[in-house]
Amino acid sequence: MAARAGFQSVAPSGGAGASGGAGAAAALGPGGTPGPPVRMGPAPGQGLYRSPMPGAAYPRPGMLPGSRMTPQGPSMGPPGYGGNPSVRPGLAQSGMDQSLKRPAPQQIKQVQQQAVQNRNHNAKKKKMADKILPQRIRELVPESQDYMDLLAFERKLDQTIMRKRLDIQEALKRPIKQKRKLRIFISNTFNPAKSDAEDGEGTVASWELRVEGRLLEDSALSKYDATKQKRKFSSFFKSLVIELDKDLYGPDNHLVEWHRTATTQETDGFQVKRPGDVNVRCTVLLMLDYQPPQFKLDPRLARLLGIHTQTRPVIIQALWQYIKTHKLQDPHEREFVICDKYLQQIFESQRMKFSEIPQRLHALLMPPEPIIINHVISVDPNDQKKTACYDIDEEVDDTLKTQMNSFLLSTASQQEIATLDNKIHETIETINQLKTQREFMLSFARDPQGFINDWLQSQCRDLKVMTDVVGNSEEERRAEFYFQPWAQEAVCRYFYSKVQQRRQELEQALGIRNT
């Protein structure tokens, strides 16, 4: 029978139906000698008989090695009516290879996904290979060597750009900061009282306090910064508190607070307005918004490491450097640290694991101190506006980091490169087609008769592949073709298949179930 996908082909002695061309079969005489040729009629709807699967000892002439013929009728059963073996008596039963069974649907899906991935991977490889001119074209057109040199240079350039992109990606994983000056302006204005003689009503005296600021421009970066949006003043801080004189404004109205939330909208400054006609002392507390977060160290640990406020990774790195410098690591158990007298006072332990240091540091780290500015709100009418300036150091993202991000996210150049690559691939494909046409015409010009014969043979092979035709029709049309040894077994298989088919039809008609 014909081999199904995923199964091993088993050659039973019973057989499949007939198909194919005309011819004659040999009748068997006494002793198994061939008798005179007997003309066989075709099966209903079929041509003359064609063996579904010749035995291994009798290969059919004109067939390609490994090819199989289409089976006819149901699968073979036993020659008797009560047995269940799948082969005829007297023949050895072939076992099916378990590894060749039909795979489960999940396995089929996995295989299909893997095939898609392999096709995508091969497509990328093929896309690179498609840009290379064949050696034959380079021999015919010497100028094509210039193109190959450019292609080699492009590969080197692509490798260099890829390395740079990887370096930039690694650099962006680390915080890139630069110190800039943040100038804070604190100013106040005084509005004296006004009386309205007609209505008998007026306005009371009041003052207004403004807190605003900006980053000082860097001459080297001013040209680049002019093209990007400026940061709002409030974006530098986590919270702001203005504390007024408690004796003047009472315990419930002397504090003005602002705290950042998830829905906070950034602003360029803060202003506070209160009634009053006397000078007011106020304290402005600014809590910087450190990114990444920074912590103030315990005074003892700060003196030991020489760090006042820093991020957690920097603090752990500094502590590790102190341990290595003073050789405090246990020589036998390297994961332990032997504390000296200073670390014993800080961590209250003589020996600890290095993995315990982050947890032990948690109790020694505190929120950073706020920036405290004392200011006097003047209500002197002669001094309508009084401004004080304060400069503080602020760590901001390096402008180079923004340029790096822009470079990595830029797709304009990639689209242009992809467009040019497509044009190159189309040009190379056209060149290959012209090369094939040239070789076709050149072969015909050198030997027209031999070329036509070879071409017809090639077309004949292609036709057989396209139409799924097997065998050799020229041999099958001759009577000698059916006098070969394989015809005896083919006849038995054909008639046995027909008997089994009629038997099943009869059982279905009579309602007989074969148990």
From Swiss-Prot:
InterPro entries: SMARCD1_SWIB_dom, SWIB_domain, SWIB_MDM2_dom_sf, SWIB_MDM2_domain. Residues 412-440 form a coiled coil. The modification N6-acetyllysine is found at K223. The modification Asymmetric dimethylarginine is found at R68, R88. One of its GO terms (molecular function) is transcription coregulator activity. Residues 43-167 are annotated as: Interaction with ESR1, NR1H4, NR3C1, PGR and SMARCA4. SMART domains: SWIB. It comes from the Eukaryota. Residues 168-474 are annotated as: Interaction with SMARCC1 and SMARCC2. GO terms for biological process: chromatin organization; nervous system development; regulation of transcription by RNA polymerase II. One of its GO terms (cellular component) is SWI/SNF complex. Residues 14-23 have a biased composition (Gly residues). The keyword Coiled coil applies. There is a cross-link at K101 (Glycyl lysine isopeptide (Lys-Gly) (interchain with G-Cter in SUMO2)). Residues 103-117 have a biased composition (Low complexity). Component of the multiprotein chromatin-remodeling complexes SWI/SNF: SWI/SNF-A (BAF), SWI/SNF-B (PBAF) and related complexes. The canonical complex contains a catalytic subunit (either SMARCA4/BRG1/BAF190A or SMARCA2/BRM/BAF190B), and at least SMARCE1, ACTL6A/BAF53, SMARCC1/BAF155, SMARCC2/BAF170, and SMARCB1/SNF5/BAF47. Other subunits specific to each of the complexes may also be present permitting several possible combinations developmentally and tissue specific. Involved in transcriptional activation and repression of select genes by chromatin remodeling (alteration of DNA-nucleosome topology). Component of SWI/SNF chromatin remodeling complexes that carry out key enzymatic activities, changing chromatin structure by altering DNA-histone contacts within a nucleosome in an ATP-dependent manner. Belongs to the neural progenitors-specific chromatin remodeling complex (npBAF complex) and the neuron-specific chromatin remodeling complex (nBAF complex). This is SWI/SNF-related matrix-associated actin-dependent regulator of chromatin subfamily D member 1. It comes from Bos taurus (Bovine). The gene is SMARCD1.
